[in-house]
Amino acid sequence: MPPPPRLSPDELAAALHGLPLWSGDGDGLRRTVQLPTFRDAVAAIVAIADVAEEMDHHPDIDLRWRTLHLALVTHSAGGVTENDLDLARRIDALLPG
């Protein structure tokens, strides 16, 4: 099955208005979130992993003590697609703002 199409710059800019905790460009979406404790950060990774497995769309996650750096991109499309936006919304539902 081919990947969904890469979003145009205008589509991405419009989508980012609805995702105020995320930044991004055609190369990917990014969000940094600080959790209260290291254990909370690890638990957040597990929750994100569950959603990612369900969606079969996997983020890049970097953990630094209690801070998560998240990056989303659809590599097979060469940029941001609706899959990335959907995953960003699902992550936002899991993590504090």
PLM-predicted stretches and their roles:
Residues 1-68, 72-97:
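Long, contiguous binding/interaction regions
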